[in-house]
Amino acid sequence: MSLSNSLGLLGRKVGMMRLFTDDGDAVPVTVVDVSNNRVTQVKTQENDGYVALQVTFGSRKASRVTKPEAGHLAKAGVEAGEVMGEFRVTEETAGKYAAGSVLPVAELFSVGQKVDVQGTSIGKGFAGTIKRHNFRSQRASHGNSRSHNVPGSISMAQDPGRVFPGKKMTGHMGDETITTQNLDVVRIDEARQLLLIKGAVPGSKGGFVTVRPAIKAKASKGAN
């Protein structure tokens, strides 16, 4: 995927619902609110060392904004948002927008397009290896005593004498950045600036997400 197509939108996960096709099939979709994405800065190769659009979404009280951030937003002429992000783009794409511009969803996405959605997964607290890493339980009987759901050996003996980093063990599960790839845009509500995306996206209701054109989108079967 070229950088010119990497411009996306910040949004909020509203929830899930279903749509019906003309054939009567039910399609599960996630509703994402991508309204009022404002450009807060156009980064250039000369000034910043790379080309990108800095975007903010949502609204925040002025009393909750730091003075440096307030000055930055005032320079762009936009109100403070709840979340801010960047999208790397080409100079041609960056030239189409200026600080204070609003990114309309209909210009960036289309029905049937493949998108990647990034968000923070739902936290599940402390979890064992069976739930966290899909391990299987050990024997229920036949010599097994009080070791039914333990992971088993986690390392070797004196050599190397330690547990290697990255070993799959018990620990905190969820609450991490997750990207779900190649989801279909089923419908676009221009009036309310909503994206209806097929399937589930990371995070809980009200969580912030980033929607980008899919980086691994496959060409259609009819393409040469």
From Swiss-Prot:
Q: Which Gene Ontology molecular-function terms are recorded? A: rRNA binding; structural constituent of ribosome
What residues bear N5-methylglutamine in this entry?
158
- One Pfam family from the UniProt entry? Ribosomal_L3
Arranged from A to Z, the UniProt key words for this protein are: Methylation, Ribonucleoprotein, Ribosomal protein, RNA-binding, rRNA-binding
- Matches recorded under InterPro entries: Ribosomal_uL3, Ribosomal_uL3_bac/org-type, Ribosomal_uL3_CS, Transl_B-barrel_sf
Function as written in the Swiss-Prot or TrEMBL entry: One of the primary rRNA binding proteins, it binds directly near the 3'-end of the 23S rRNA, where it nucleates assembly of the 50S subunit.
* Name of the protein this chain belongs to: Large ribosomal subunit protein uL3
| Species of origin | Delftia acidovorans (strain DSM 14801 / SPH-1)
Organism placement in taxonomy: Bacteria, Pseudomonadati, Pseudomonadota, Betaproteobacteria, Burkholderiales
Task: Supply the gene name.
Answer: rplC
